[in-house]
Amino acid sequence: MTPLSSADTLTLHGQTFASRVLLGTSRYPSLQSLSDSIAAARPGMVTVALRRQMNAGAAEAGFFELLKRHDVPLLPNTAGCQTIAEAVTTAQMAREVFETDWIKLELIGDDYTLQPDPVGLIEAATLLVKDGFKVLPYCTEDLVIARRLLDAGCEALMPWGAPIGTGKGIVNPYGLRVLRERLPDVPLIVDAGLGVPSHACQVMEWGFDGVLLNTAVSQATHPEIMARAFARGVEAGRAAYLAGPMDARESAHASTPVVGMPFWHQDGSHA
């Protein structure tokens, strides 16, 4: 797949990425399936969970070698953290292990919905930004929280579409669209809850800057095919946004213009 133009690239923290797809690396049926999915999606970044990888043992011995072969920028995350101290410590460890100051900040406040802890998220983001991290916080579509995260020094946000792993798509279209409208110059990556490529296409049509996928791909019957489908959906949605879609209207409008009367009506001989 080719980009719409060489100029239409995703830019985060001053760094450009050729793809607007970010791909998670957890819960694939095999390392080969993960490798095939990365090749199919051609993501701009792949996320890695330090806590999960450290506990994976010998079964995942080839995981990091696989990532090196694909040569895709890594975005470590703080998945599984429930306190500010856990998140900050995990981020610092990830910086040492992966040799990057990029971090996707996850701080879960509820085990049932896996909803982010908004108060802790802001405090953790503040600490990590001061420590030199490029923080991409996983948050909800709450506009006030989003602004507080920006005030804390975050330059891009990752609002959810729906709770992690549900595949429900966009549960609050109004909230996400308002977030996009009110923060027009902030990179926004929709993260979590997307289930099928049409969900990704939809948010890209609304002007979001990218999507992060994991469960929708890794738990598909054929992950590689789904990864490719999502990449195409993202590209289609982005193209539609740039094309400038027509406004929806309440009344019908003929698509073919009518000028004058048909020639066979003009002589009055028609039945």
Curated annotation (Swiss-Prot):
Molecular function via GO: thiazole synthase activity
Kindly indicate whether the keyword Manganese belongs to this entry: no
Where does this protein hold 1-deoxy-D-xylulose 5-phosphate?
G165, A192, G193, N214, T215
Q: Is Zinc among this UniProt entry's keywords? A: no
Query: What's its top-level EC category?
Result: transferase
Q: Which reaction does it catalyse?
A: [ThiS sulfur-carrier protein]-C-terminal-Gly-aminoethanethioate + 2-iminoacetate + 1-deoxy-D-xylulose 5-phosphate = [ThiS sulfur-carrier protein]-C-terminal Gly-Gly + 2-[(2R,5Z)-2-carboxy-4-methylthiazol-5(2H)-ylidene]ethyl phosphate + 2 H2O + H(+)
Q: Which domain of life is it from?
A: Bacteria
| Compartments, record wording | Cytoplasm
User: Which GO biological-process labels does this protein carry?
Assistant: thiamine diphosphate biosynthetic process
Which EC number(s) does the record attach to this protein? Answer: 2.8.1.10
**Part of which pathway?**
Cofactor biosynthesis; thiamine diphosphate biosynthesis
Describe the subunit structure: Homotetramer. Forms heterodimers with either ThiH or ThiS.
- Family of this protein: Belongs to the ThiG family.
The protein here is known as Thiazole synthase
